[in-house]
Each structure stands twice: as C-alpha cells, then as structure tokens.
C-alpha cells in the first residue's frame, strides 16, 4: 500500500486527486450560492430556539430569490448580525417602514417558542434592527433532520476536525487506482 508513496508520479497524482475533490466541493458550494442567491445556501440550526419547527442539528436549504415579494411577519428567515459570522435562524416578529417614510424596511426577530424577548441582545452594539442586506435566506425550502449534528460535533470538539481530515488524507494517499 505504501509503495505508491515511493513513486513520485503516483504521489503527485494522488495529491492532485485530493485537490480535485476539494475544488469540486468548493465549486458545488459556490454554484449553489449563485442558484439560491444566498452566500450561505445551507445552514445548520445550532440551538433549540426554533423548536418544535426545527430541531437543533437540522440542516436547512435556503432560497433567497423571492424578488417580488417582501419579507412578512411570521416568516422564518436566516440572517447575519454585523461582526458575527454565524447565521441565525429565527422568525420575523415585527416589521417597520414602508419604503416611503422610512426609506428602508427594518425587522425584529425571535425564536419560535423558546424566547421570551426579541433578538436585539444578539445584534451588534448599536444595532437595533436588521435590514434586507442582513437577511441571507428568506425561504426555507427544505430541511434534513439531524444531518447537521456532524457540524455541531465538529465545532464543539475541535480535535474531531483533525481526526476527520487525517482519515480523509490517509484514504486519499492509500487508495489504489
């Protein structure tokens, strides 16, 4: 098995194969981002604030191409808060502005059943509302229950990332063609 490592061409071919796998995954992600018009077309529910609609660990598929409809109260959306890079999945609880008096619409959000207040405590300092540019996914078009637990486990236990990458690298190096 390890004899392939002695052959420089075989080792280079395996490294290129590994690079091809990574670049294909990246291109699929970017393609899905373009199709869904969302920088993050797939998100994982990280907390229980959306139960019973979505459980912790559910994988959500987003669609952001509702160009001619406005985000309405009661709709579940995914948004980013300034200076934080973790998307939040919550329901719109309030909407301000019509586009005439207030030039931009503002929204307030909160989880479905577990929160007793709005999400302003999650916003960046000085940010009281969210605007359309903060919303990265307007429609949840599908979900896969519990599939996102892999992401949660990898973020809660960083050593698992190293083990997983090591196993993937070992499989690529030891595979025969």
UniProtKB/Swiss-Prot annotation:
Lipid bilayer topology: Single-pass type II membrane protein
PROSITE patterns: SPASE_I_1
Active site: 49 (charge relay system), 90 (charge relay system), 119 (charge relay system)
GO BP, sorted A to Z: signal peptide processing
Entry GO CC: signal peptidase complex
Stored InterPro entries: LexA/Signal_pep-like_sf, Pept_S26A_signal_pept_1_Ser-AS, Peptidase_S26, Peptidase_S26B
Sequence segments annotated as region (C-terminal short (CTS) helix): 163-174
Localization in the cell: Endoplasmic reticulum membrane
Enzyme Commission identifier(s): 3.4.21.89
Gene3D superfamilies in the record: Umud Fragment, subunit A
Residue positions the entry lists as glycosylated: 115
Molecular functions (GO terms): serine-type endopeptidase activity
Class of enzymatic activity (EC top level): hydrolase
Major location category of this protein: endoplasmic reticulum
Assigned protein family: Belongs to the peptidase S26B family.
Entry's free-text remark on domains: The C-terminal short (CTS) helix is essential for catalytic activity. It may be accommodated as a transmembrane helix in the thinned membrane environment of the complex, similarly to the signal peptide in the complex substrates.
Subunit field text: Component of the signal peptidase complex (SPC) composed of a catalytic subunit SEC11 and three accessory subunits SPC1, SPC2 and SPC3. The complex induces a local thinning of the ER membrane which is used to measure the length of the signal peptide (SP) h-region of protein substrates. This ensures the selectivity of the complex towards h-regions shorter than 18-20 amino acids. SPC associates with the translocon complex.
Function according to Swiss-Prot or TrEMBL: Catalytic component of the signal peptidase complex (SPC) which catalyzes the cleavage of N-terminal signal sequences from nascent proteins as they are translocated into the lumen of the endoplasmic reticulum. Specifically cleaves N-terminal signal peptides that contain a hydrophobic alpha-helix (h-region) shorter than 18-20 amino acids.
This protein's name: Signal peptidase complex catalytic subunit SEC11
Origin species: Podospora anserina (strain S / ATCC MYA-4624 / DSM 980 / FGSC 10383) (Pleurage anserina)
UniProt lineage: Eukaryota, Fungi, Dikarya, Ascomycota, Pezizomycotina
Gene: SEC11
